[in-house]
Amino acid sequence: MYPIVKKRVLNETVTLMEVQAPLVARKAMPGQFIIFRIDEEGERVPLTIAGYDREKGTVTIIFQKVGYTTEKLDSLNEGDSLLDFVGPLGEPTKTEGIHRCAVIGGGLGVAIAYPQAKALHDAGAEVDLIVGFRNEHLIILKDELEAACTNLIIMTDDGSNGNKGFVTQALQKQIEDGRDYDTVIAIGPLPMMKAVSEMTRPLKIKTIVSMNPIMIDGTGMCGGCRLTVGGETKFACVDGPDFDGHLVDFDEAMARGRMFRAEEARAKEKHFCNLTGEAR
């Protein structure tokens, strides 16, 4: 069992948890992920490692309440335990050779962008961290983000905090203002990562995207997380999650991501009814 030692609500839909998992913490690196299971009847869910403390033996995860399992996870508190917490899985983010970069996080992707930006910043790279939220009430980890970069740019859809607009607009302005990036890292919704990759393609800026497709076993056996990258089949769990954004078939990835929306909605509705006793 893996005890939850800290729970922190970041906004109305996003929660941070620290989980006691010393073996995972000992080996974890930025960009890797874990797969957890709440109990014997639970599904296996992948979450990117948002942080780790090797001395305390803890791993930090950040999740958004979007379906049955994340709703159930959010109902747990400090002192409760998870049945399974497997990892670290996937390839860590490669920081070698990166000197001036833009790390872009959209929505919950900010939680994944944070450890990658911090690793690059700690390694001596000049990091512009561009993060986007719908409004100021959804902003998370602001203090941590400021400490993890050279320059923090906050974008909100409604202009309630930082600059009004989208992360792609902020990246475009940075490039137009003469920022000479050797690498761009984009993490977040597939349409955003696709837009960033299309923007940097003609400029020949190396672009890395973090892919989080449907995943079950995390070892490459089930094939659920397969992607087409450069015309070849890759598996996000073992070959990724980081890939060359100029080679990823985003349209295929988006189509696969929509495959089980109806089933996910029904599971969430059933969970709500079980919790409240209400019929919908």
Name every feature range the model reports, one short phrase each.
Residues 1-80:
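Ferredoxin-reductase
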Residues 6, 51, 154-156, 209, ...:
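Structural signal for conserved beta-strand scaffold positions within catalytic alpha/beta enzyme cores
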Residues 36, 84-85, 227:
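A generic structural signal for residues embedded in beta-strands
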Residues 42-51, 89-96, 237:
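Short, Lys/Arg- and Gly-enriched loop/turn segments at beta-strand edges
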Residues 71-216:
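FNR/FR-type flavoprotein reductase catalytic core
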Residues 112, 190, 212-242, 271-278:
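Local cysteine-cluster metal-coordination motifs and their immediate loop/turn environment
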